[in-house]
Amino acid sequence: MSPTLDDQSPMEIRCTEEGAGPGIFRMELGDQRQSISQSQRWCCLQRGCVILGVLGLLAGAGIASWLLVLYLWPAASPSISGTLQEEEMTLNCPGVSREEELLPSLPKTVSFRINGEDLLLQVQVRARPDWLLVCHEGWSPALGMHICKSLGHIRLTQHKAVNLSDIKLNRSQEFAQLSARPGGLVEESWKPSANCPSGRIVSLKCSECGARPLASRIVGGQAVASGRWPWQASVMLGSRHTCGASVLAPHWVVTAAHCMYSFRLSRLSSWRVHAGLVSHGAVRQHQGTMVEKIIPHPLYSAQNHDYDVALLQLRTPINFSDTVGAVCLPAKEQHFPWGSQCWVSGWGHTDPSHTHSSDTLQDTMVPLLSTYLCNSSCMYSGALTHRMLCAGYLDGRADACQGDSGGPLVCPSGDTWHLVGVVSWGRGCAEPNRPGVYAKVAEFLDWIHDTVQVR
């Protein structure tokens, strides 16, 4: 029979220190003290050691955890840089592969530029610091087209020979001659020379792109003025905005393949492309341009949005002006480093909770992030392919959203803007560790040029 509370005094358990040795405890039951035998002392000693050991381990683990948190916790900073974000994610996501950082970057053997009012073609050979004027000997329109495409332009518009006697040159000016090797690579065909035998050099003009004549946020974005992004277009099905697009040439725009795939059963005559719009309220005064042909990338995957680009050929050309123009493609081998400040624009949702697109064009600045970072276990766990890139903030302050798909992600190189990405997909909008994912335009240059040239 168990004693009742009335039968005995309340039990009190407490530990007291016994003897000179610290940490050795004995148990007392209320005031009923008893003498402790030698075996009982030895038992208490063993138990005390066990308790001390456990407490010591717990204390050590606590201190170690505290130091680890102090060491690994990312410091808050208002500025965003690609390096800082990558460091944070590398520390917090063990096992992240840095494979792409280990890939050697090959030095460019030749660079081109078009300089001055005379549009003189210049070449920089084998990393020499000086720019060489190109001699006209051996020149061909095909070579001009190749150079224009390597600079991010869609096509060659004009080329001619210029007499050296008609321009002022520095005495130290040197030239580049084409080698006579048939079938050689363009990048290996240039030879520095002190003069041009014919006394003529090359003037080259490519299709205009990447300029913002009137240039003076999307979630977290701001409304933009007319002409700020002259290549921005709206792809409409009837009177409904479905996706953004970017103007490449008067007859061509590029958008996301998933935009067209979602409405693949729609009649071609129902599609219109509107360029130069800032507000969709002006659509009634803007007839738009009918779509002649929809050309999604042949390898597009609806499962993971790989190869998520499509070209739209227009029935009539877009009229270029101060508020409407083409964006440049990435120049050949052009690299925008992680952390580069780029811009995304569109008419998508301005708040993740909204169900309707914005009536006015929005834009926001986002930094480029490395693919290894976005493929980490903290973000997209390997979902990005080599045809994708991502941009945004780890804290989710600004991002593209529904309705922005197909629109441009552009990055500046001097005063020229290049189409680096096409808005493709993401998980949520402006959520932490969920930046926007874009089709990487540099991976589609050959397909774009081949498609545009043969039609």
UniProtKB/Swiss-Prot annotation:
It comes from the Eukaryota. Residues 1-49 are cytoplasmic. One of its GO terms (cellular component) is neuronal cell body. The chain crosses the membrane at residues 50-70. One of its GO terms (biological process) is proteolysis. The active site is at residues 258, 308, 405. GO terms for molecular function: serine-type endopeptidase activity. Residues 112-207 form the SRCR domain. Its EC number is 3.4.21.-. The record marks 217-218 as: Cleavage. Residues 218-453 form the Peptidase S1 domain. PROSITE patterns: SRCR_1, SRCR_2, TRYPSIN_DOM, TRYPSIN_HIS, TRYPSIN_SER. It is an enzyme of class 3 (hydrolase). InterPro entries: Peptidase_S1_PA (IPR009003), Peptidase_S1_PA_chymotrypsin (IPR043504), Peptidase_S1A (IPR001314), SRCR (IPR001190), SRCR-like_dom_sf (IPR036772), Trypsin_dom (IPR001254), TRYPSIN_HIS (IPR018114), TRYPSIN_SER (IPR033116). It is a single-pass type II membrane protein. Glycans are attached at residues 163, 170, 319, 375. It is found in: Cell membrane. Keywords: Cell membrane, Disulfide bond, Glycoprotein, Hydrolase, Membrane, Protease, Serine protease, Signal-anchor, Transmembrane, Transmembrane helix. Disulfide bonds join 135-196, 148-206, 209-328, 243-259, 342-411, 374-390, 401-429. Residues 71-455 are extracellular. May play a role in hearing. PANTHER family: ACROSIN-RELATED (PTHR24252), SUPPRESSOR OF TUMORIGENICITY 14 PROTEIN HOMOLOG-RELATED (PTHR24252:SF17). Belongs to the peptidase S1 family. This is Transmembrane protease serine 5.
